[in-house]
Regions:
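Short terminal alpha-helical segments
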Residues: 2-38
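Amphipathic alpha-helical binding modules
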Residues: 69-115
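Charged, low-complexity interaction regions
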Residues: 26-41, 58-66, 88-95
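Composition-driven detection of intrinsically disordered, low-complexity segments
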Residues: 46-51, 110
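Compositionally biased, low-complexity segments enriched in small residues
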Residues: 8-11, 42, 56-57, 74
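Short, aromatic- and cysteine-enriched interfacial helices/patches
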Residues: 1-8, 63, 113-115
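Amphipathic alpha-helical interaction surfaces
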Residues: 49-60, 78-81, 85
């Protein structure tokens, strides 16, 4: 389906989308529990953009443009930073927490089937 470079880019972008989306939902829940309006607005805005990027990626064989890839990479760094300030981080790592139930290969295959 892809050359090696495109396959790696596909996996990287889809991993970033998944982790940022699921962490954003987690962080939004924390913000809502503490009634932190600034954080609620921040995560709602980020989740809306991630959703748009996810939908756009499905129209482009799972690959995003360079700027969107940079955005997700920077957002993932922010997500990790916030995650490691939570109690959950004492139990497991960011990567071990935000992983699809069926594993990455099944997740990637599900995405490919949506093209």
């Amino acid at each position: 389906m892809f050359g090696f470079g495109k396959a790696k880019l596909f996996q990287t972008h889809q991993t970033l989308l998944y982790q940022c989306m699921h962490f954003g939902e987690f962080a939004l829940g924390l913000a809502q529990e503490s009634a932190d309006e600034d954080q609620i607005e921040f995560w709602e805005t980020k989740l809306a953009r991630i959703t748009k990027l996810r939908d756009a990626s499905l129209r482009k064989n799972g690959i995003l443009d360079k700027e969107d890839g940079y955005f997700l990479d920077a957002l993932r760094e922010k997500c990790e930073e916030v995650f490691y300030k939570t109690e959950l981080s004492k139990q497991q790592s960011f990567d071990d927490t935000f992983i699809p139930d069926g594993g990455w290969e099944d997740h990637f295959e599900d995405i490919r089937s949506n093209f």
